[in-house]
Amino acid sequence: FDYIIIDLGRSLSRISLPIIQKSDLLILILGTDQGTVTITKSVTEYLKTLGIDLKKLYLILNRAIGLEGITKTDAEKILDLDIKMTMPYMGGNFTTANNQSQPITHKFPNDTGAFMLRSLAKNIIEETR
């Protein structure tokens, strides 16, 4: 396979750590609440102690609840890392597409979120070349 995507959820375990260590790119999706950003900082510091090059991280700030919460700039300052992309709040479009078992990029192709997801896919491919 050219690409293998594994969703490791929220845990670091004896099973997930070797996968993380062998990965070419690690995508971390974080929310806009202070607690999530703080935990992400702890995780990135831990990954660094394992010898993982933090340049392999591709951070995405997910605005799942609108404009509330921490800004991209503030999150980058806390993390001392660049956030590569911010996913916009998609309102009810995401839920509608999900409930109808349709990709958001097909159900709402002109939605800003759909555009960002297509851009994300392109950027990830470029990052791994």
Put a short name on every predicted segment.
Residues 63, 75-104, 117:
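Beta-strand-loop-alpha "switch" segments that mediate conformational coupling across diverse proteins
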Residues 2, 10-34:
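Inter-motif core of Ras-like GTPase G domains
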Residues 31-32, 57-69, 86-93:
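G-domain G4 guanine-recognition motif of GTPases
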Residues 99-129:
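NTP-binding/hydrolysis catalytic cores, primarily Walker-type P-loop NTPases
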Residues 40-54:
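Conserved C-terminal guanine-recognition region of P-loop GTPase G domains, centered on the G4
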Residues 23-25, 53-57:
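Short glycine-/polar-rich loops that comprise or flank the Walker A/P-loop
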Residues 3, 25, 81-85:
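Well-ordered beta-strand positions
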